[in-house]
Amino acid sequence: MILQQPLQRGPQGGAQRLPRAALGVTWGLDASSPLRGAVPMSTKRRLEEEQEPLRKQFLSEENMATHFSQLSLHNDHPYCSPPMTFSPALPPLRSPCSELLLWRYPGSLIPEALRLLRLGDTPSPPYPATPAGDIMEL
């Protein structure tokens, strides 16, 4: 904690520092002082008076239900003026079909591919390749 002495205006309008003895300060700021970082009693009393007791907030099921019923995911709030409409990220499917795509994360195949490259073999795919026209349906 850094304590500064108050400034007093002199007759010429310049600022002058008052000595510590004139201010009634009796402790030092060195590390060996037992009062280092201590708060004077007058300040302590003032801090205690300024602190208000915490008010308890009682939450009931009815209050929570009311609160959650007023929440909205839509942009109909007063701070959204005018309402914004968002275009869909993907166009809607015209004729959806059930296709199955078999895919495996290649991260698990990287060590195997490196091992095969060191040996000089060509890696074989873990799944047999299907011709471009073949589609598996469910």
From Swiss-Prot:
SUBUNIT field: Interacts with HCFC1.
The entry's cellular-component GO terms read: cytoplasm; nucleoplasm
Q: Which gene encodes it?
A: HCFC1R1
Q: What tissues has this protein been observed in? A: Widely expressed.
Know the name of this protein? Host cell factor C1 regulator 1
Q: Where is this region: Interaction with HCFC1?
A: 76-79
Q: Which UniProt keywords apply?
A: Cytoplasm, Nucleus
Short motif Nuclear export signal, span: 110-119
Give yes or no: UniProt keyword ATP-binding.
no
Chief subcellular location equals cytoplasm
> Superkingdom, according to UniProt?
Eukaryota
Instruction: List where in the cell it is found.
Output: Cytoplasm; Nucleus
The job of this chain, per UniProt, is described as: Regulates HCFC1 activity by modulating its subcellular localization. Overexpression of HCFC1R1 leads to accumulation of HCFC1 in the cytoplasm. HCFC1R1-mediated export may provide the pool of cytoplasmic HCFC1 required for import of virion-derived VP16 into the nucleus.
